[in-house]
């Protein structure tokens, strides 16, 4: 092809959020297709998108690889015109990062406040000291190196570096309307700053005055003795994106297309143009085109030059990091295996230490060990998971909890001699105390060497529809109707049926336009947020590697690159993750120690100790149990019937897209239950290799269930090379690469079939791999989670009182709301007592035994809107010097420790709580110990003076006035009490809303949930109604929706097939009280579903709960006295049904997708 003749230096990608109209990858692809010499990505005060452009150069489908220029568009807060800044080498790149970091760290999240003085401070020609900095390479494996200026002689770059040139190349970008003197002044300041290395951009705007305008700019440039340089100031890779870019402008400026006016581009010309078009536009000034080539040729920097160095860790005098790691390993062996280890485990540990030494990863392991050590010193539960669970060294260091004697380890999946990839250790900490660990990391390494990885928040269907609707000027009702038809977070847009269900015309041109633009917008980056816990640490300044900015959360900073970006540039991260179940387990252990005198740690709970725990799980009794409480897992438990720890490993992994999409679940269950023989696939005609898969698939009965098995089949049976297997692993491991995994299909299935394997087996194996590309568990990860499955199941079985209390104190977390957690505990014999000012604390607590278990007293934290403090965060308050947050509960406890409460007036005076707090307590029925039910308490509270503690003489006066004026109050109906309970504490101990509607539904032939769940006749028609607890639409279910209904008798599980879902989308997605008719589907193991055929939203029936004629059905099972919160107050009369009360909507369901 002919030599390139143009380089576009002014590209704004969609990482200039709500401005650029194309992805960085699209610009690279288009530049390649156009044959451009180079392309410069310069986003607004950010480098967030450059790694994606850099990675795209590895795309084998590019027929030509343009040179990539890494830069940023500096936008100033002091009126300085925009400036494109491109570093010539690694040192200049470091200064650009620090410049951007300075602007970001003085501003709020997502903002960058720069002044010209900042540019002066960081634009120095002297190269800063950079320990370990290698000389920039003159070539890049990421780009075809073509001399972009024929006049530049070979060795020019070397001469520049020898002369000490290291600078930011600065291009002043004048706005469309400009004052000549302002541009002249800006150029004067820039040339005074660094002499050469300054340009003036010449940009055509196609508004009829380009010739005159560009001539003015050329005269200014000549007078300032700086070259003019051509650019199209690009906003999108193709002109078809103009409409979408207009929408982004409207979203950014909070306006509509009709009102935006001159905020919008006047034409569609701001796209990436071919050389010929740019040459035509600048035919009167061809040197402006040639200058783009000279500009690009002066830049040698590429991201290949980023040489990441992990921080050194402190070690004892005279020891290396590797020696110290070995010492800690030996100490761990002595602690975990006091009787010594066998030869096999010794060989495993020695092998791991050898690989760690060769890869020089010892400091990384020491870092994670230190973080875990700190957490445990603060009594914070933690455990490692993921591929790190393949490491015996991690186990004896106390990082992971998977005993290497219980499971076969595959260390090569974690760290390999062949793979040039850093290890990645994920450690889960209690979600309520993880912030303490994160602040410890900041203190230890400093904010210039430690920061959190970012997460790119992308447009998803709902947000895209909402923003496009607003930009196009659609009414809020129309936009909401369209958005409400979308289920979940991901998707490709709306179909015609969904539009019709929203009550809209799918042929309406405005609706069509909105849907088309929203579909195009899906997947666009919206803004950056912080990763859930991935830290990057560096030996030198992190802010010379990548810009750092402030997070929205106080005391948090994060870098501009996400986990895939740092992987591309080979940075190592430490994942400090939050897990609610660890909080629950620790709080459960604390309650057991406090009330039962026994202290437990995670390691004390052995997974083979209690056969009754497995029996409980076999029955599917897993509400609240980690990882196995979803409907799919509850249905799998009776079918798989786990009997040992490894069965739990399989249970965790089997209900995942990988095994499901690969059609591996049913064959495994049939073999496990003896319904089909265990056979191992083997290649026909290869007698010597007949059992080559037995060692891989032996533990899973010849059926591949885990990611590691799929990889090993690819290597050993499909004969993938290690490099190909690594590419396959990477494609499986990241969500972003879903779709690219398909390129391995022909090779893997073809190789398996060619070697004599059954084509069906070959295809199923690959379908499983594609499932892992969406979401799948490796064996090591499943083993880590299986440990917590057992511990939480043990807590539930052995200490249901402590488990319930701890779950409530750890909310929000898990699959079920407090009402279901409490209901499950009551079914297991635990008494639950209501919130009461005489007995409750801020947290839920255990009280004296009532039968086999302690009673659970609900705490003030259960009252919505009531202020309470979580003392798990006390260390953070102290470290920051902050005052603890207001805790109304603590005031109550402090007051009653001084003197018992005798009346509402005395309570108000003693606690000095604001009126708002008193109303919340009354509405939560928390004054029963003062012989006041909800209505009487609300009436009495409202008669008190507002927010003024009552003096003693005023108390007597107020009481006399109340006695004189008060009329007898009718008792609140029980139905209204139940609804009020749900509104205030999100559960009721007095009854269930459905029991008051039972007569209504019974008249319609509606069965109770228990009756449906106990039916064993397949195909029998049934009707059911209940409150929607959970909606779930897992990706592996191919559009099937699972719904859990609850009534006063229990729960029923619904299956909604895609066709029914589309027909009744509104009811499925929005109903709080759902009526359903369908057919029973019962499995031999006793798992029952109602397959829905018709659904009706009956939420309006909730209004009947305020009807004075509604009473509980006589057939309803009476509430057991054990769980009646009137037990504390026997002198209160039973509730009678007298008077209506406004009924509010019940709390929403928990929806998962």
From Swiss-Prot:
A GO cellular-component term linked to this record: cytoplasm
Catalysed reactions, semicolon-separated: DNA(n) + a 2'-deoxyribonucleoside 5'-triphosphate = DNA(n+1) + diphosphate
The family this protein is said to belong to: Belongs to the DNA polymerase type-C family. DnaE2 subfamily.
Role description: DNA polymerase involved in damage-induced mutagenesis and translesion synthesis (TLS). It is not the major replicative DNA polymerase.
Domain of life: Bacteria
Organism the protein comes from: Rhodopseudomonas palustris (strain BisA53)
Name by which UniProt lists this protein: Error-prone DNA polymerase
GO MF annotation: an example: 3'-5' exonuclease activity
EC number: 2.7.7.7
Biased composition (Basic and acidic residues): 1116-1131
Record-linked HAMAP family: DNApol_error_prone
Cell compartments where the protein resides: Cytoplasm
Region of interest: Disordered: 1107-1153
Biological process per Gene Ontology, one example term: DNA replication
Keyword terms: Cytoplasm, DNA damage, DNA repair, DNA replication, DNA-directed DNA polymerase, Nucleotidyltransferase, Transferase
């Amino acid at each position: 092809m002919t030599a390139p003749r143009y380089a576009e230096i002014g590209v704004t990608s969609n990482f200039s959020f709500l401005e650029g109209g194309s992805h960085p990858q699209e610009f690279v692809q288009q530049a390649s297709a156009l044959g451009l010499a180079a392309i410069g990505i310069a986003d607004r005060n950010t480098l967030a998108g450059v790694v994606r452009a850099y990675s795209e150069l590895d795309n084998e489908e590019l027929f030509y690889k343009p040179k990539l220029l890494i830069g940023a568009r500096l936008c100033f807060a002091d009126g300085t015109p925009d400036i494109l800044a491109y570093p010539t080498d690694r040192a200049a790149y470091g200064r650009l990062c620090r410049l951007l970091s300075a602007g970001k760290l003085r501003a709020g999240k997502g903002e960058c406040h720069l002044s010209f003085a900042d540019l002066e401070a960081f634009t120095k020609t002297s190269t800063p000291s950079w320990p370990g900095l290698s000389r920039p390479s003159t070539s890049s494996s990421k780009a075809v190196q073509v001399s972009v200026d024929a006049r530049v002689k070979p060795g020019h770059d070397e001469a520049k570096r020898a002369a000490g040139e290291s600078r930011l190349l600065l291009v002043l970008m004048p706005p469309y309307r400009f004052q000549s003197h302002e541009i002249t002044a800006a150029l004067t300041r820039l040339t005074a700053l660094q002499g050469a290395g300054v340009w003036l951009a010449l940009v055509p705007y196609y508004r009829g005055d380009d010739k005159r305008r560009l001539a003015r700019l050329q005269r200014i440039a000549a007078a300032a003795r700086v070259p003019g340089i051509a650019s199209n100031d690009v906003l999108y890779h193709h002109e078809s994106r103009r409409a979408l870019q207009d929408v982004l402008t409207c979203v950014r400026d909070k306006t509509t297309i009709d009102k935006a006016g001159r905020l919008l581009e006047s034409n569609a010309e701001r796209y990436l143009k071919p050389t010929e078009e740019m040459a035509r536009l600048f035919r009167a000034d061809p040197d402006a085109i040639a200058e783009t080539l000279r500009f690009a040729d002066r830049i040698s920097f590429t991201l290949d030059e980023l040489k990441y160095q992990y921080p050194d860790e402190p070690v004892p005098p005279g020891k290396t990091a590797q020696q110290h790691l070995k010492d800690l390993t030996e100490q761990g062996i002595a602690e975990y295996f006091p009787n010594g280890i066998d030869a096999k485990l010794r060989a495993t540990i020695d092998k791991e230490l050898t690989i760690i030494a060769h890869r020089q990863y010892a400091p990384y392991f020491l870092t994670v060990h230190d973080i875990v050590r700190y957490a445990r010193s603060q009594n914070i539960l933690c455990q490692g998971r993921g591929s790190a669970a393949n490491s015996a060294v991690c186990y004896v260091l106390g990082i992971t909890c998977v005993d290497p004697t219980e499971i076969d380890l595959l260390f090569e999946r974690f760290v390999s001699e062949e793979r040039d990839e850093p290890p990645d250790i994920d450690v889960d900490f209690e979600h309520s105390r993880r912030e303490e660990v994160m602040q410890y990391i900041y203190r230890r390494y400093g904010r210039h060497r430690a920061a959190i990885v970012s997460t790119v928040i992308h447009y998803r269907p709902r947000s895209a529809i909402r923003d496009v609707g607003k930009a196009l000027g659609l009414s809020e009702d129309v936009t909401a109707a369209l958005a409400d038809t979308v289920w979940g977070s991901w998707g490709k847009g709306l179909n015609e049926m969904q539009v019709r269900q929203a009550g809209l015309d799918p042929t309406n041109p405005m609706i069509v336009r909105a849907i088309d633009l929203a579909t195009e917008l899906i997947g666009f980056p919206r803004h950056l947020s912080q990763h859930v816990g991935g830290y990057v640490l560096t030996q030198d300044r992190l802010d010379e590697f990548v810009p750092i900015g402030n997070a929205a959360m106080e005391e948090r900073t994060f870098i501009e690159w996400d986990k895939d970006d740092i992987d591309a540039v080979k940075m190592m991260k430490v994942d400090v993750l939050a897990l609610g179940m660890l909080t629950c387990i620790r709080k459960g252990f604390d309650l057991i120690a406090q009330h039962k005198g026994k202290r437990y740690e995670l390691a004390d709970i052995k997974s083979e100790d209690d056969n009754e725990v497995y029996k409980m799980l076999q029955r599917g009794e897993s509400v609240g149990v980690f990882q196995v409480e979803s409907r799919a897992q509850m249905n799998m438990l009776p079918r798989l019937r786990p009997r040992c720890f490894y069965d739990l490993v399989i249970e965790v992994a089997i209900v995942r897209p990988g095994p499901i999409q690969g059609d591996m679940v049913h064959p495994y269950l049939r073999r496990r239950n003896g319904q089909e023989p265990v056979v191992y696939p083997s290649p026909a005609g290869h007698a010597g290799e007949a059992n080559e898969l037995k060692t891989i698939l032996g533990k899973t009965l010849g059926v591949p269930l885990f990611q590691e098995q799929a990889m090993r089949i690819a290597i050993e049976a499909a004969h993938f090379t290690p490099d190909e297997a690594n590419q396959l692993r990477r494609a499986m491991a990241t969500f972003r690469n879903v779709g690219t995994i398909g390129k391995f299909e022909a090779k893997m299935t073809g190789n398996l079939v060619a070697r004599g394997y059954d084509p069906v087996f070959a295809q199923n194996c690959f379908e499983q791999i594609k499932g892992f590309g969406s979401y799948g568990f490796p064996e090591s990860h499943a083993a880590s989670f299986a440990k917590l499955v057992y511990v939480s199941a043990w807590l539930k079985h052995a200490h249901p009182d402590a488990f319930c209390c701890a779950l409530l104190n750890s909310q929000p977390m898990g699959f079920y709301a407090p009402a279901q957690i409490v209901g499950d505990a009551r079914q297991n014999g635990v008494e639950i007592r209501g919130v009461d000012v005489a007995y409750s604390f801020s947290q839920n607590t255990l009280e004296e035994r009532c039968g086999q278990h302690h009673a659970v007293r609900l705490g003030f934290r259960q009252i919505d809107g009531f202020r309470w403090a979580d003392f798990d965060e006390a260390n953070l308050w102290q470290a920051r010097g902050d005052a603890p947050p207001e805790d109304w509960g603590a005031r109550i406890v402090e007051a009653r420790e001084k003197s018992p409460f005798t009346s509402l007036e005395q309570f108000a005076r003693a606690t000095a709580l604001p009126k708002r707090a008193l109303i919340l307590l009354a509405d939560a029925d928390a004054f029963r110990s003062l012989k006041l039910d909800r209505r009487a308490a609300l009436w009495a509270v409202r008669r008190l003076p507002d927010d003024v503690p009552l003096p003693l003489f005023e108390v007597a006066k107020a009481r006399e006035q109340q006695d004189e004026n008060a009329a007898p109050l009718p008792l609140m109906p029980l139905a209204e009490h139940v609804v009020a309970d749900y509104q205030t504490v999100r559960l009721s101990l007095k009854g269930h809303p459905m029991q008051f509607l039972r007569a209504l539904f019974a008249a319609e032939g509606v069965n109770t949930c228990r009756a449906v769940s106990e039916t064993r006749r397949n195909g029998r028609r049934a009707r059911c109604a209940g409150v929607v607890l959970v909606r779930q639409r897992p990706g592996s279910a191919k559009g099937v929706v699972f719904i859990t209904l609850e009534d006063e008798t229990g729960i029923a599980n619904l299956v909604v097939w895609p066709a029914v879902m589309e027909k009744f989308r509104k009811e499925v997605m929005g109903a709080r009280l759902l009526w359903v008719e369908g057919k029973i589907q019962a499995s031999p193991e006793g798992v029952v579903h109602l397959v829905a055929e018709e659904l009706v939203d009956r939420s309006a029936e909730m209004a009947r709960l305020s009807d004075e004629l509604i009473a509980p059905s006589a057939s309803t099972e009476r509430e057991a006295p054990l769980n009646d919160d009137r037990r504390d107050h026997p002198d209160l009369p039973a509730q009678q049904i007298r008077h209506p009360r406004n009924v509010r909507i019940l709390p929403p369901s928990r929806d998962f997708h």
